Amino acid sequence: MSAAGAGAGVEAGFSSEELLSLRFPLHRACRDGDLATLCSLLQQTPHAHLASEDSFYGWTPVHWAAHFGKLECLVQLVRAGATLNVSTTRYAQTPAHIAAFGGHPQCLVWLIQAGANINKPDCEGETPIHKAARSGSLECISALVANGAHVDLRNASGLTAADIAQTQGFQECAQFLLNLQNCHLNHFYNNGILNGGHQNVFPNHISVGTNRKRCLEDSEDFGVKKARTEAQSLDSAVPLTNGDTEDDADKMHVDREFAVVTDMKNSSSVSNTLTNGCVINGHLDFPSTTPLSGMESRNGQCLTGTNGISSGLAPGQPFPSSQGSLCISGTEEPEKTLRANPELCGSLHLNGSPSSCIASRPSWVEDIGDNLYYGHYHGFGDTAESIPELNSVVEHSKSVKVQERYDSAVLGTMHLHHGS
């Protein structure tokens, strides 16, 4: 003990123990826990002597009691008027620093309850929790943390208490302090916001059947397209089945090029097609048909999609319809049980507009005007509202053909009449 040797050198001829007993009787009583001697001395000692520092460590009697864990002596000194937050002249250390370094949690807790400042730094910028980390006292660290000690404070060398414990080899204390630091850093990140992360700005994207082009409904500020307001999206009527997860369904929404759909040769009106279409991946799918006397019918059964999304009908149950597919001659074809077409057509608009189901070029188009009108594919970017309803086009085509047959019959009759 170099400090004690220096003190003994000052008083030549005296041992450190003799010097302590003669010159600093209060300090000696606190070291040994001699409560009777301490109480007797406190009755005779002036109040100013309670703050006197020894020549060995530069401690007051309170520091001695705290370092050696003499709680009864500490209590008597404070009752006699000793100051809790008194700092030493040499290192500016309080009794809380000394108790933490000595590894005495009982004394430390009592000092805290009596009003000691546990975040006061010493001359090296260290608080009591740094001293507890140096001594490896997990009990003192826990007591300090439980009473509001700051675990993230750094000393003059830039080290936290966790760094000091790690340097001294106290792994358990270091890990405990590191966990506390991480907990403290994450304390302000709540409501699903992670450290360094962001909140989901699109909370409504979990709707399974939502079209990818329309899923960002409330994001006008981000420059994306607003959703249509005419009707509810199909996702409310399209449940997840077969245990498919949200991620699986979301993967099905990846935009792809629209496949060419089988020609709608002599098909029925689009209203029947839209009515009997089934929902796959959030879009309307229009089932393919088998040729019937050289014609293809679009009226068929709605099947469950491959990803478990159905239109609400039981599998195998044909969609009820009061009429079959109309041929050019006006006769009805019986309804058939059909299979879903794996090739989906463009489905930007699901409100019955033609761009939801127009093929590359309908095979029933004959004249040059119709060819020009349907000369391009109505897919992404087309405004369906600017295109006339397909029912009207079909009806017009049928009317023209009927008129041509009527004119042909009239001309034939006139030729026969005049020829005879």
From Swiss-Prot:
InterPro entries: Ank_Repeat/CDKN_Inhibitor, Ankyrin_rpt, Ankyrin_rpt-contain_sf. Disulfide bonds: none annotated. ANK repeats lie at residues 21-50, 57-86, 91-120, 124-153. The keyword Repeat applies. Gene3D superfamilies: Ankyrin repeat-containing domain. Keywords: ANK repeat, Repeat. GO terms for biological process: protein targeting to chloroplast. The keyword Repeat applies. GO terms for cellular component: nucleoplasm. GO terms for molecular function: chloroplast targeting sequence binding. This is Ankyrin repeat domain-containing protein 10. It comes from Homo sapiens. The lineage of its organism: Eukaryota, Metazoa, Chordata, Craniata, Vertebrata. The gene is ANKRD10.
